[in-house]
Amino acid sequence: MTWSQDLAHKTYSIRHWADGYFEVNDAGHMVVMPLGGDGVRISLPEVVDAARAAGAKLPLLLRFPDILGHRLGKLQAAFAQAQSEWEYAGGYTAVYPIKVNQHRGVAGVLASHQGDGFGLEAGSKPELMAVLALSRPGGLIVCNGYKDREYIRLALIGRKLGLKTFIVIEKPSELRMVLEEAKTLDVLPGLGVRVRLASLGAGKWQNSGGDKAKFGLSPRQVLDVWKVLRGTEYADCLNVMHFHMGSQISNVRDIAKGMREATRYFVELSRLGAKITHVDVGGGLGIDYEGTRSRSDCSINYGLQAYASHIVQPLASACEDYDLVPPRIVTECGRAMTAHHAVLIANVTEVEAVPEGRVPGVCDDEPAVVRHMREIYGELDARPAIELFYEAQHFHAEGLAAYTLGQIDLVHRARIDDLFYAISHGVRERLSHEEKSHRPVLDELNERLVDKYFVNFSVFESIPDVWAINQIFPIVPIERLNEVPTRRGVVCDLTCDSDGTVKQYVENESLDSALPLHVLRHGEAYRIGFFLVGAYQEILGDIHNLFGDTDAVEVAVDGRGYRIAQQRCGDTTDVMLDYVGYALDEVRRVYAQRIAAAGMSAAESKALSDMLEAGLTGYPYLSDVPLE
């Protein structure tokens, strides 16, 4: 089959997960389209080269703030269309929960969009302090999470300053504190209740909804809240009904089911006399990380318009049936707003190729297990391949046991491995996925016979959800996509941890245990992109092996194509050591003391001192200069 652009797109499932923001150009480069398919196309290798020329180093996080605005616009347009179709007059506000990515370059860009169609959500005191500064005058702020009196006072101060803050009651004890602090500050609070739905979405994040959810009020607790407020000056302050169906909901039916239950709460609260002006449906809108358009955990079987319609329709019908004023619909779809806007670029530092397998020459003292393996290899064209592979596995295991017991030496142990790999490659060539009986063995061989691509990054820092919850992220070389990828490899990071390996890859509208990659060329960089990493990954990343934040640049669209709008240096080694309690002055003193005690010349002492200082203040990651 002739390699082509279309085949590159198909191999890496790009058109299914990219959602119109990424594609391959004629030069074989991955390109980004921050304004969607009709906008400017920016070559990722060119951006990386420009950033490196400006001093940035790999691994490098590329942020495209224009994608944030474009995603927000698509979300608002989808709800505008759904409300038009269902003749719903309540309006819509897209709220960004900053826990998804609190960086100023993300939350600030989104907050710069004016109008009633955007708001912010905070789930902690530090987040609330950020949101109070980011929000526009009169802007909607949803205050979620655990609350103490200070949190509540800060939210109420926001209302006194002209912000539309709503304190969502998630625990029965919070209401009393809110009313007491409101009285002290002489302000009418904006109140909401978070109802705990029984409906439960499937997937990795299902515990954020359902009866066992961490947050939310039971039906009895909701009634108790209303009982306290009813007939008081605060009764008209209860304006928000909030709930959460889950995060990254894969199946649109789960959304429909959750909305049916939530709509009943809205109707009942309204019939009791509560003036619910906002229904906050929480998050749930998923991203198709896999590009499989399915109900699997890291995919979705619906589009943005279908999501909006399934939110609007139940509320529209309920308002018509019960003659209720349509409430403003609020969503907290932070993942959908931010995932596409960030790409991590890292260079491959080395490849450990899978042994091709060779048939060693016969020696006089050859153990029986080696002779058996040699006989199996000689029968590859004469006997069923699967039968031969199982025999090879048996004798390979027998050989390992014999070596452990001291019955064979290292030379013969190596010969057994050579023959086993030669047999494995020969068996794989004789199997086909078209034959159902071949598939289990072929899958096992494809998983075993892969190269290890060592990449200059940390799984735990840059894509921690891969380690924590087996999250899928699309991974694609950003160059040479006009060439056939002749190798299959797994991506391994720099950490001293076997978990620092990516185990599943997006390929051909499915998932596989390895990724099609290219052979490295001497003196030439080979760079890989990790896509859809804009939600949660920066914030959740940890410092395993003291690998810290990577360098990052913001790439903005302008009249000439693009410009590097902002560059942020990543953590240096001294920053990481200070973070874990090392006194840097003491570290430097010890270095100097040991150099002085080594009895070297002044010139050599200075050279070593300079190298130690450079190591202390340098980037924790490896050099991004390709090896000659």
UniProtKB/Swiss-Prot annotation:
GO molecular function, one term: metal ion binding
Cofactor annotation: Mg(2+); pyridoxal 5'-phosphate
Record field: catalytic activity: L-arginine + H(+) = agmatine + CO2
Pathway, per record: Amine and polyamine biosynthesis; agmatine biosynthesis; agmatine from L-arginine: step 1/1
Residues involved in substrate binding: 279-289
Positions where N6-(pyridoxal phosphate)lysine occurs in the chain: 99
Enzyme superclass (EC): lyase
InterPro entries on file: Ala_racemase/Decarboxylase_C, Arg_decarb_HB, Arg_decarbox_C, Arg_decrbxlase, De-COase2_CS, De-COase2_N, Orn/DAP/Arg_de-COase, PLP-binding_barrel
GO BP term, pick one: putrescine biosynthetic process from arginine
Enzyme Commission (EC) number: 4.1.1.19
A Pfam family it matches: Arg_decarbox_C
Gene3D superfamilies hit by this protein: 1.10.287.3440, 1.20.58.930, Alanine racemase, Lyase, Ornithine Decarboxylase, Chain A, domain 1
Alphabetical keyword list: Decarboxylase, Lyase, Magnesium, Metal-binding, Polyamine biosynthesis, Pyridoxal phosphate, Spermidine biosynthesis
Function: Catalyzes the biosynthesis of agmatine from arginine.
The family this protein is said to belong to: Belongs to the Orn/Lys/Arg decarboxylase class-II family. SpeA subfamily.
Protein name: Biosynthetic arginine decarboxylase
Organism: Xylella fastidiosa (strain M23)
Source lineage: Bacteria, Pseudomonadati, Pseudomonadota, Gammaproteobacteria, Lysobacterales
